[in-house]
Amino acid sequence: MKRPQADFVRRLADIAWAHSGDKGDMVNLGVVVHDEADYALLLREVTEQRVLEHFKDICRGEVRRYELPNLHAINLVLTQILDGGPMRSLRLDPQGKTLGDSLLIMALEDQSDPASKSTPGR
């Protein structure tokens, strides 16, 4: 039975996990796909521009993306996002630990239902 399109929103969390941490006033976001078959999708969807748009209310700097193909992962560096860093910021999350989870709620533009893509052996 096919789900109605309105009920289905594919998010980054459906294909990957993330870990984040601070480096002064910068944050590193490591994003790793669950299945190496989704690495190309990760590269298409998680661009520097889309990440900057996702964090537009709190990121005053830039986003740099580093590809790690052997790990099926990317590392994102967001600058000027922690209001001066953990020792100066009055933010609730001065180390940016919640930003990885925040990124995972980003909707993917590719809204094809992964359940409709059968993989042999699964």
Question: What spans do the regions from the language model cover?
Answer:
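Long, contiguous binding/interaction regions
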Residues: M1-R122
